[in-house]
UniProtKB/Swiss-Prot annotation:
Reaction(s) catalysed (UniProt annotation): adenosine(1518)/adenosine(1519) in 16S rRNA + 4 S-adenosyl-L-methionine = N(6)-dimethyladenosine(1518)/N(6)-dimethyladenosine(1519) in 16S rRNA + 4 S-adenosyl-L-homocysteine + 4 H(+)
InterPro entries found in the cross-reference section: KsgA/Erm, rRNA_Ade_diMease-like_C, rRNA_Ade_Mease_Trfase_CS, rRNA_Ade_methylase_Trfase_N, rRNA_adenine_dimethylase, SAM-dependent_MTases_sf
Main enzyme class: transferase
Stored PROSITE patterns: RRNA_A_DIMETH, SAM_RNA_A_N6_MT
High-level lineage: Bacteria, Pseudomonadati, Pseudomonadota, Alphaproteobacteria, Rickettsiales
Gene: rsmA
Cell compartment(s), UniProt: Cytoplasm
SMART domains reported for this sequence: rADc
Record-given protein name: Ribosomal RNA small subunit methyltransferase A
CDD domains per the UniProt record, alphabetical: AdoMet_MTases (cd02440)
One term of GO molecular function: 16S rRNA (adenine(1518)-N(6)/adenine(1519)-N(6))-dimethyltransferase activity
Main location: cytoplasm
Entry's family note: Belongs to the class I-like SAM-binding methyltransferase superfamily. rRNA adenine N(6)-methyltransferase family. RsmA subfamily.
Length: 262
């Protein structure tokens, strides 16, 4: 399809286009009802996912794309869906989505893999603005997002996302659905935002705890937490947390208790 449009994917933008509407329809269906929601799509590419979204009749769709070569394709879609679709030529990392759309909002996207994690970390800062995210990630990143304690993939991302939402891996996809084919597997995940965080916690302090512990994840927390807490052993004992544990063994609640003790 990109050959027909004379648009060749740029490696520096992590462009891997999905040309099959069967696949994009399936991804959009994972988002559930969208007719009562405004939708944001990041990296719409050749518009296959864009059409899948618009065909499910959202209140409104805004797509954000950095590659100006794709503008003519999306101008045609704008004209076709008069008033329903808006195309913004910009870098999504530089946009506060709260300034361009009104809630309720869902994000549906095949994210460019090189900015997928930075985008998600940015959106976490105002996650209560959104209802849900249905996102295609590199499988390795998706596995980190949904990982539970005592799993090698359990990470800072796991804790921060799951503190604020319910996460579900919907489906894994092979490289063959993309053009060009990446060298990795991909996964679609659903992130359903909770009405409030699972536990009350100071998010700045939690981030500090996560950084010092996962920064040296093979070390026991009694060692790494000394960078933040003087009387580490006493505090961990008072919280009934084994000081010989490593960060991948701690629950989200335990991380929050430690953060609240600083």
């Amino acid at each position: 399809m990109y050959h027909v449009n004379r648009i060749y994917p740029k490696k520096e933008l992590s462009q891997c286009f999905i040309s099959s509407s069967h696949i994009t329809d399936k991804i959009v269906n994972y988002a559930g009802n969208i007719s009562d929601y405004s939708i944001i799509e990041i990296g719409p590419g050749l518009g296959t996912m864009t059409y899948s979204i618009l065909n499910k009749n959202p209140k409104r769709l805004i797509s954000i794309e950095k590659d100006s070569r794709l503008m003519p394709i999306h101008k045609k879609i704008v004209d076709e869906f008069n008033g329903k679709y808006e195309f913004i030529l910009s870098d999504a990392l530089n946009i506060d989505l709260r300034t361009i759309i009104e809630p309720p909002v869902k994000i549906i996207a095949n994210l460019p893999y090189h900015i997928a994690t930075p985008l998600l970390m940015k959106w976490i800062n105002y996650i209560d603005f959104f209802t849900s995210f249905t996102l295609m990630f590199q499988k390795e990143v998706a596995d980190r997002i949904v990982a539970q304690p005592n799993n090698k993939n359990y990470s800072i991302l796991s804790v921060l996302i799951q503190l604020l939402s319910n996460v579900y891996k919907m489906e894994d996809f092979g490289p063959e659905i993309f053009s060009p084919q990446p060298k990795v597997m991909s996964s679609v995940i659903n992130i359903i935002v909770l009405p409030k965080p699972r536990f009350n916690v100071n998010h700045n302090k939690l981030s500090q705890v996560l950084k010092v512990t996962f920064g040296e994840r093979r070390k026991m927390i009694r060692s790494t937490l000394k960078k933040l807490i003087n009387n580490t052993d006493e505090i961990l004992q008072s919280l009934n947390i084994n000081n010989n544990l490593r960060p991948e063994n701690l629950s989200i609640e335990q991380f929050c208790k430690i953060a609240n003790s600083i």
